[in-house]
Protein backbone atom coordinates (compact mmCIF):
# COMPACT_ATOMS: atom_id res chain seq x y z
CA UNK A 1 0.00 0.00 0.00
CA UNK A 2 1.50 3.32 -1.04
CA UNK A 3 0.59 6.35 0.97
CA UNK A 4 1.17 9.76 -0.55
CA UNK A 5 1.13 12.50 2.03
CA UNK A 6 2.08 15.16 -0.58
CA UNK A 7 2.92 17.55 2.19
CA UNK A 8 5.69 19.97 2.85
CA UNK A 9 6.40 18.23 6.16
CA UNK A 10 9.68 16.28 6.02
CA UNK A 11 8.37 13.78 8.59
CA UNK A 12 5.41 12.97 6.34
CA UNK A 13 7.68 12.64 3.31
CA UNK A 14 9.97 10.32 5.25
CA UNK A 15 6.99 8.18 6.27
CA UNK A 16 6.14 7.85 2.57
CA UNK A 17 9.41 5.92 2.28
CA UNK A 18 9.91 4.07 5.58
CA UNK A 19 6.45 4.13 7.15
CA UNK A 20 5.04 0.93 5.65
CA UNK A 21 4.70 -2.10 7.87
CA UNK A 22 7.95 -4.11 8.17
CA UNK A 23 10.19 -1.45 6.59
CA UNK A 24 11.74 -0.20 9.83
CA UNK A 25 12.34 -3.80 10.93
CA UNK A 26 14.10 -4.58 7.64
CA UNK A 27 16.31 -1.55 8.18
CA UNK A 28 16.96 -2.62 11.78
CA UNK A 29 18.05 -6.05 10.56
CA UNK A 30 20.40 -4.60 7.95
CA UNK A 31 21.88 -2.22 10.53
CA UNK A 32 22.47 -4.97 13.09
CA UNK A 33 23.39 -7.88 10.81
CA UNK A 34 24.97 -6.08 7.86
CA UNK A 35 24.50 -7.34 4.28
CA UNK A 36 21.74 -9.94 4.02
CA UNK A 37 20.44 -12.26 1.33
CA UNK A 38 16.74 -12.26 0.55
CA UNK A 39 16.42 -15.71 2.16
CA UNK A 40 18.09 -14.45 5.35
CA UNK A 41 15.58 -11.64 5.58
CA UNK A 42 12.73 -14.09 4.96
CA UNK A 43 13.94 -16.23 7.86
CA UNK A 44 14.24 -13.16 10.08
CA UNK A 45 10.59 -12.23 9.42
CA UNK A 46 8.65 -15.49 8.95
CA UNK A 47 5.26 -13.74 9.16
CA UNK A 48 6.09 -11.38 6.28
CA UNK A 49 5.15 -12.68 2.84
CA UNK A 50 7.92 -12.90 0.22
CA UNK A 51 5.96 -10.45 -1.97
CA UNK A 52 5.85 -7.89 0.83
CA UNK A 53 9.57 -8.30 1.51
CA UNK A 54 10.32 -7.87 -2.19
CA UNK A 55 8.14 -4.75 -2.41
CA UNK A 56 9.74 -3.17 0.67
CA UNK A 57 13.26 -3.86 -0.59
CA UNK A 58 12.43 -2.41 -4.03
CA UNK A 59 11.06 0.75 -2.41
CA UNK A 60 14.18 1.12 -0.29
CA UNK A 61 16.32 0.57 -3.40
CA UNK A 62 14.38 3.15 -5.41
CA UNK A 63 15.03 5.72 -2.70
CA UNK A 64 18.73 4.92 -2.45
CA UNK A 65 18.52 3.55 1.11
CA UNK A 66 19.41 -0.05 0.23
CA UNK A 67 21.57 -1.40 -2.56
CA UNK A 68 21.12 -4.83 -4.12
CA UNK A 69 24.54 -6.28 -4.87
CA UNK A 70 24.68 -9.17 -7.32
CA UNK A 71 27.53 -11.64 -7.68
CA UNK A 72 28.52 -13.71 -10.71
CA UNK A 73 28.53 -16.92 -8.68
CA UNK A 74 26.93 -20.18 -9.74
CA UNK A 75 24.16 -20.22 -8.76
CA UNK A 76 23.83 -16.42 -8.92
CA UNK A 77 23.39 -14.70 -5.60
CA UNK A 78 22.59 -11.23 -4.35
CA UNK A 79 22.55 -9.46 -1.06
CA UNK A 80 21.12 -6.24 0.28
CA UNK A 81 23.25 -3.64 2.01
CA UNK A 82 22.57 -0.20 3.42
CA UNK A 83 23.89 2.75 1.45
CA UNK A 84 25.36 5.82 3.13
CA UNK A 85 21.87 7.30 3.03
CA UNK A 86 20.50 4.18 4.73
CA UNK A 87 23.19 4.22 7.40
CA UNK A 88 22.10 7.76 8.29
CA UNK A 89 18.95 6.16 9.73
CA UNK A 90 20.94 4.40 12.49
CA UNK A 91 20.38 7.15 15.09
CA UNK A 92 16.68 7.22 14.24
CA UNK A 93 16.35 3.49 14.92
CA UNK A 94 18.47 3.82 18.05
CA UNK A 95 16.09 6.53 19.30
CA UNK A 96 13.07 4.34 18.52
CA UNK A 97 14.67 1.50 20.49
CA UNK A 98 15.35 3.72 23.51
CA UNK A 99 11.80 5.07 23.39
CA UNK A 100 10.40 1.54 23.14
CA UNK A 101 12.48 0.33 26.08
CA UNK A 102 11.19 3.21 28.15
CA UNK A 103 7.51 3.28 27.15
CA UNK A 104 6.51 -0.24 26.09
CA UNK A 105 6.41 -3.57 27.83
CA UNK A 106 7.85 -6.77 26.35
CA UNK A 107 5.28 -9.49 25.62
CA UNK A 108 4.50 -11.89 28.40
CA UNK A 109 6.28 -15.28 28.07
CA UNK A 110 3.11 -17.06 26.89
CA UNK A 111 2.67 -14.48 24.05
CA UNK A 112 6.29 -14.39 22.90
Model regions and ranges:
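N-terminal intrinsically disordered/low-complexity leader segments
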Residues: 1-7
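Short, contiguous, well-ordered secondary-structure segments
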Residues: 4, 14-17, 29, 64-67, ...
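Basic, amphipathic "hinge/linker" alpha-helix immediately C-terminal to the N-terminal HTH DNA-binding motif
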Residues: 19, 72-95
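Canonical helix-turn-helix DNA-binding module
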Residues: 39-71, 75
Amino acid sequence: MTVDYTQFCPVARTLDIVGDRWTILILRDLIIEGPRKFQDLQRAFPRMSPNTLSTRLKTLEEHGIVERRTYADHPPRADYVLTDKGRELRPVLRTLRVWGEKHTKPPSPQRA
